[in-house]
């Protein structure tokens, strides 16, 4: 049950967490997490606020509409835990790098590089482990960002096919070592 708050600007809409509470938790156990533009805005990657909510969950679900919001689901192969959620959001941002509104892929790479550097060594190691369940271009992009920041990238490099090229709209200025990772 949600009681809307009234302000001088009118009635406030509920926050995405309130609208999607039943998709995020079941019987006190985490079963999903908010990702997509809502999460990317909270990470500082975009300033756009959207009426669509993307939820990462371990099982497939069809999109649905709730009030003014369109809720869609992203199937997540990794376990969803409190500790993993911020790391999964970083990987999701890399996955959707071309689709994040009001931001250039170059600025996103720089911001994600800063976020990854601020993680502890254990979190960085866990990020690499979680990346193994993502597509190869996400692993290549993560590897290039981590290598640029002098972080360990050996397992990411080994997980990639050395002959595959990735066409991503990222400049040499943002990622000078992109050719090492076959990013064109």
Q: Which residues are covered by each model-predicted region?
A:
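Short beta-edge/loop segments at beta->alpha junctions of small alpha/beta modules
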Residues: 1-25
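Short gly/ser-rich loop at a beta-strand->alpha-helix junction or flexible surface loop bordering the NTP-binding
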Residues: 5, 27-66
